[in-house]
């Protein structure tokens, strides 16, 4: 509906353009809510149609978030699907750049909902943007970045509130500018701790079964930690009945304990001062660190 309204408005103000249906161009499988792009068919459709249209007009309007399934039924592309649609068209058309418009001035080092003194990145490597989005930065999804990275197409994140501002450029640079810690909060996390009933060790066979179960339930694991006798996973909130079904199924072979309403804190390029300030006064449940990333599951 939105694209139809905009197309009609463009007609009224005399802006020459073409209106095309995304479902005729982005072809997907039939996983309706998280459809996977069929890149071969999509490339063929976009190259054949869109390049021809651009010979007569400079502006094309189409929908984001949706594609056409194998039976020509409408599918959706999942979280941040509209940005992903732009990346798909850009990849297939070998675009010079892509700009996505948000309600923030660019890619920030923290969510303004939690921090008053956020800072904007001027430039970010593709790899770092993917890392940030993987850990939960909501501004961009990894699947939007990957096709652009494959062809070195720059991605600009700008604010529709201040369209003349530069925003953030994501490209093949070597380091973020400026170099500073990034903070990501994921609230309302659930922690499941799983123990073999026979006091055996948690080995590959156990982990394989547990991973398969989480995949079947469509649950994305945000943090995991295993010891010789237990395996713990942290994930986003799910419906009570789904959680109970998961626990019931796990309880056939394992003892299960769980905690809810936790916060997962991730710091990229952390400093010890940043860690101290963030976990001060909080009950620490799990802590993990690598060379560049520190994660803390805490009870507020």
Segments (PLM) and residue ranges:
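Nucleotide/pyrophosphate-binding catalytic subdomain
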Residues: 1-140, 299
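Short phosphate-binding/catalytic loops that engage adenosine nucleotides
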Residues: 15, 153, 219
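Electropositive, surface-exposed helix/loop patches at the edges of structured domains
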Residues: 52-69, 132-156, 192-207, 257-278
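Short hydrophobic alpha-helical runs that function as membrane-insertion/retention elements
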Residues: 97-101, 155-157, 222
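A conserved regulatory-domain signal marking ACT and ACT-like small-molecule sensing domains
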Residues: 166-300
């Amino acid at each position: 509906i939105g694209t139809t309204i905009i197309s009609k408005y463009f007609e009224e103000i005399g802006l020459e353009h073409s209106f095309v249906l995304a479902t005729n161009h982005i072809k997907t499988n039939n996983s309706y809510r998280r459809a996977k792009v069929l890149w071969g068919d999509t490339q063929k459709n976009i190259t054949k149609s869109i390049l021809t249209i651009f010979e007569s007009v400079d502006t094309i309007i189409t929908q984001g978030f949706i594609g056409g399934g194998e039976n020509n039924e409408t599918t959706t592309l999942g979280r941040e699907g509209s940005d992903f649609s732009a990346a798909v068209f850009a990849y297939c058309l070998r675009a010079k750049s892509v700009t996505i418009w948000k309600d923030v001035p660019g890619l920030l080092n923290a969510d303004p909902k939690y921090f008053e003194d956020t800072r904007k990145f001027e430039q970010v490597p593709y790899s770092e943007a993917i890392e940030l989005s993987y850990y939960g930065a909501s501004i961009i999804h990894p699947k939007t970045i990957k096709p652009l990275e494959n062809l070195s197409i720059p991605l600009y994140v700008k604010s529709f509130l201040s369209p003349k501002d530069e925003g953030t450029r994501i490209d093949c640079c070597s380091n973020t500018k400026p170099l500073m810690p990034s903070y990501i909060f994921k609230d309302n996390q659930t922690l499941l701790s799983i123990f073999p009933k026979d006091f055996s060790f948690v080995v590959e066979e156990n982990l394989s079964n547990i991973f398969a179960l989480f995949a079947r339930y469509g649950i994305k694991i945000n943090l995991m930690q295993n010891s010789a006798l237990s395996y713990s996973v942290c994930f986003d909130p799910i419906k009570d009945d789904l959680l109970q079904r998961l626990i019931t199924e796990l309880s056939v072979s394992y003892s299960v304990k769980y905690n809810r309403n936790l916060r997962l804190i991730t710091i990229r390029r952390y400093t010890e001062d940043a860690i101290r300030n963030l976990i001060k006064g909080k009950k620490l449940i799990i802590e993990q660190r690598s060379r560049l990333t520190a994660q803390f599951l805490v009870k507020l």
